């Protein structure tokens, strides 16, 4: 795997992460479609994810939490808006409160695109924020480093599936 680039665009209110993998597009798609594979890489190594619901269809929803080094378990949700298997999906990604309900605030819109390459697949994650303040807040929370750490785990998951 090669993390090609991470780019923040304050004018467009986006953060784009591009990575390439030595695996076919269907295999990379399964990293998103299979909740057991997804939870093996979604989140940095020190904050593993547990998906309690994962309905990857338009109008579907995913619920998850991450477990931190001190046992804290912040929750998150995805509202699935578009699915074009095996090349594209769009989710609204937000935090949940302690009861598991969507927390106040605008979710981040995350678009995932997968493109076939000779001998592999390019994955592009484009996160679009509601405001510059939201983008800044997520950067301060470590989103950029967290995504890089998460993506670094993908090769191991792909190797086991091969």
Where are the regions that the model predicts?
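Hydrophobic pocket/interface hotspot
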Residues: 28, 38, 62-64, 80, ...
């Amino acid at each position: 795997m090669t993390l090609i680039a991470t780019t923040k665009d304050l004018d467009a209110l986006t953060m784009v992460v591009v990575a390439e993998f030595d695996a076919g597009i269907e295999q990379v798609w399964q990293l998103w479609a299979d909740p057991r594979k997804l939870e093996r890489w979604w989140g940095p190594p020190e904050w593993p994810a547990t998906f309690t619901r994962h309905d990857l269809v338009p109008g579907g929803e995913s619920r998850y939490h991450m477990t931190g080094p001190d046992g804290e378990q912040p929750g998150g949700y995805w509202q699935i808006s578009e699915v074009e298997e095996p090349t594209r999906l769009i989710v609204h990604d937000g935090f949940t409160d302690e009861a598991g309900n969507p927390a106040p605030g605008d979710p981040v819109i995350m678009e995932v695109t997968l493109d076939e390459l000779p001998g592999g697949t390019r994955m592009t994650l484009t996160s679009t924020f509601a405001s510059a303040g939201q983008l800044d807040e997520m950067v301060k929370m470590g989103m950029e480093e967290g995504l890089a750490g998460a993506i670094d785990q993908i090769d191991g998951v792909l190797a086991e599936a091969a």
